[in-house]
Amino acid sequence: MATPPSQVRQNYHQDCEAAINRQINLELYASYVYLSMSYYFDRDDVALKNFAKYFLHQSHEEREHAEKLMKLQNQRGGRIFLQDIKKPDRDDWENGLTAMECALHLEKNVNQSLLELHKLATEKNDPHLCDFIETHYLDEQVKAIKQLGDHVTNLRKMGAPKYGMAEYLFDKHTLGESDS
């Protein structure tokens, strides 16, 4: 049975609707990756509780991003079509530096996708979608990328992963004192 057209839909191009659904999938994938990271660092043979806490917080944030997009999709009269969520590329995150580097790469990919979504919204003359992306996503992405870049730099300066003490101290003093 075909889905009836929305009575609230206005100036919402089907390409934007499809792109929002792809972005929802990407945000859920990012949440899934961070969840994998979190429980890797929570393992008894890894035991870096603040890395685990940090990545769990990131997982929740990414899921909230997906939910915000789902709410937008309904508000604009679009239809949500969920896709399979790809499993993370790895199950063993090796060490804190590797995980932070992977997280940085992931956030840059999410940011690029958001920039492309913004470009599409501009091309389709959708100021509401442009404003939504600018207000709720772009600034937060830039801050997340900067924070992860700083974490990668500090872990490298401390000698991670060669010196295990570096990760322990980073876990305790950097991640242990942060709000996330």
From Swiss-Prot:
Q: Its catalytic activity?
A: 4 Fe(2+) + O2 + 4 H(+) = 4 Fe(3+) + 2 H2O
Positions that bind Fe cation 2: E62, E107, Q141
What organism does the UniProt record list as the source?
Gallus gallus
Q: Which UniProt keywords apply?
A: Cytoplasm, Cytoplasmic vesicle, Iron, Iron storage, Lysosome, Metal-binding, Oxidoreductase
Gene3D superfamilies reported for this sequence: 1.20.1260.10
Q: What is the lineage of its organism?
A: Eukaryota, Metazoa, Chordata, Craniata, Vertebrata
Quaternary structure (record): Oligomer of 24 subunits. There are two types of subunits: L (light) chain and H (heavy) chain. The major chain can be light or heavy, depending on the species and tissue type. The functional molecule forms a roughly spherical shell with a diameter of 12 nm and contains a central cavity into which the insoluble mineral iron core is deposited.
Its Enzyme Commission number? 1.16.3.1
> This chain belongs to which protein, by name?
Ferritin heavy chain
Q: Where is the Ferritin-like diiron domain?
A: 10-159
- Xref: CDD domains: Euk_Ferritin (cd01056)
Main location, first listed in the record: cytoplasm
**What's a single GO MF annotation on this record?**
ferrous iron binding
Name the source's superkingdom: Eukaryota
Instruction: State the compartments where it is located.
Output: Cytoplasm; Lysosome; Cytoplasmic vesicle, Autophagosome
Q: Which GO terms describe its cellular component?
A: autophagosome; cytoplasm; cytoplasmic vesicle; lysosome
Which example biological process does GO assign this protein? Answer: immune response
Q: Which residues bind Fe cation 1 per the record? A: E27, E62, H65
